[in-house]
Design a protein with these regions (language model features):
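Intrinsic disorder/low-complexity polar-acidic segments
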Residues: 140-365
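Feature for intrinsically disordered/low-complexity regulatory segments and propeptides
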Residues: 1-149, 171
């Protein structure tokens, strides 16, 4: 199994105002923010970029109101204008606005969905903000709704709690609950269940704990992803040690399917996992630990490929990875270990999801 640094990366970089100790606190913040937002459909020829404020950029529509660009919405607007956002950030705002307007004028006319927020006065004057520019087919699932769903599930399963971690930079200090992080681009949520100890088949006498990891973006930065897994522990630096994916749910923010299925899908995966007894889960892992998939690498690859677990390349790489880390690559547990390590090493979200799903299917092989 491999360490999961997803939450650690957020823990080490997020400011305090994007950190939340409970689902209740996160939900209150997100609901207030969602109430300030609205969606507007428009076409590219109706968008005009202007230099605004102190070397800032904004967009103006038919109403004449100015909406400030965020770092993320500038990326999206630059994409629509076929212009490099990183380069534009180094230009004076008047020149950057001219470049964007030219790019929009020569690009094929397209429809867009604008996600606007009326930001209240809070150290700065009240203003309108463009949080996202997406296609009309974008199906936004509000993080506040996702957190409300998790909150309801947690109330029926109170053993799921926020991990105890250090404050950022406070190594060795007192630990405090941290359920996750949320900013203007995405949100990360983590819960753990230490009340159910799962025997580790690779380390007799040791036990694994259950965890949930959920990621969502309202502005087109990420999919809606839910991972349920086992780990050795979650440490004070928010590293999920020796993690192993058991089940996963992942959907793109596009079309009607995610609107219909996200609520039920998250609940089904969560409840199925919560209702699985420690004895059943231990038996499942022990069986995977001893289950032989084949006498050698070609046979293992052939057995798993025929059942459409993964590609031959992925299975072969997982076999090598398991062997490299002193696991038996001819067993289901060894391949699970190899696939998990490959997932942690991949820079591509879609590939990580596919590898995690493959590992989950190997456990049920």
């Amino acid at each position: 199994m491999a360490n999961n640094y997803t939450m650690h990366q957020q823990w080490s970089t997020r400011p305090d105002d994007e950190r939340f100790s409970t689902l209740d606190a996160m939900l209150d913040h997100l609901k207030a923010e969602a109430d300030q937002c609205r969606t507007l459909d428009t076409d590219s020829d109706m968008i005009r970029v202007i230099s605004h404020g102190d070397n800032d950029l904004g967009v103006v529509g038919k109403s004449g109101n100015v909406a400030h660009l965020t770092h993320w919405s500038l990326n999206q607007l630059a994409g629509a204008a076929k212009s490099p956002a990183a380069y534009l950030r180094h230009l004076p705002s008047t020149l950057a606005a001219a470049c964007l307007n030219h790019g929009l004028s020569v690009a094929p006319r397209a429809s867009h969905q604008l996600y606007l927020r009326q930001c209240p006065a809070n150290g700065t004057p009240a203003h309108l903000e463009l949080r996202a520019l997406t296609s009309p087919g974008y199906s936004r699932i509000l993080t506040s709704n996702v957190v409300a769903r998790l909150q309801a599930l947690q109330s029926n399963n109170p053993e799921w709690q926020a991990p105890l971690v250090y404050r950022r930079g406070d190594f060795g200090g007192d630990r405090e609950p941290c359920v996750g992080f949320s900013g203007d681009r995405d949100a990360y949520i983590c819960l753990q269940n230490e009340g159910v100890g799962i025997a580790d088949p690779a380390a007799p006498g040791e036990h694994l704990t259950r965890f949930i990891l959920l990621v969502n973006s309202e502005v087109g930065a990420k999919r809606l992803d839910l991972t349920l897994g086992l780990c050795e522990r979650i440490c004070g630096n928010f590293i999920i040690w020796n993690s192993r994916t058991i089940a996963a749910f992942s959907m793109r923010h596009y079309g009607d399917k995610i609107r219909r299925e996200w609520h039920r899908g998250i609940g089904q995966v969560f409840n199925d996992y919560s209702n699985l007894s420690a004895r059943d889960e231990t038996a499942k892992l022990q069986a995977a630990h001893v289950r032989q998939l084949g006498p050698g690498k070609p046979e293992v690859i052939d057995a798993l490929f025929k059942r459409e677990i993964a590609t031959k390349q992925q299975i072969g790489d997982a076999y090598d990875m398991a062997e490299r880390h002193d696991r038996n690559p001819r067993t289901a547990w060894g391949i699970v270990h190899g696939l998990t390590r490959l997932s942690q090493m991949s820079p591509y979200a879609d590939e990580r999801i596919d590898l995690d799903r493959a590992a989950s299917r190997v456990l049920d092989f």
